[in-house]
Amino acid sequence: MASPSWYVIEHPFTRPVVSNPYPSSSFALDAADKVHGERLRRVRVADNEVWIGGIIVCSRKKAMAYKFKIKDWEGRYYA
């Protein structure tokens, strides 16, 4: 079974910018904190989805459900 991929999505409602995949949620959460420059309050919206100050940290399955254009580990876009 492949390891789950996690993504950091900035500006989800206007111009979504999706990061490269992270191997675990902890790496993705740390990356989202670095975008803001400080640790902000985390709001768990649903399974595999956390909002941090207007940034979404979610799994590949959630990102595909929201129809964001995401990349795999080789840099190819998922269909």
Map each language-model feature to its residues.
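Short, mixed-charge low-complexity intrinsically disordered segments
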Residues: 17, 30-79
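The identity of the second residue at the extreme N-terminus of proteins
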Residues: 2-3, 65
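Conserved aromatic
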Residues: 22-26, 57-58
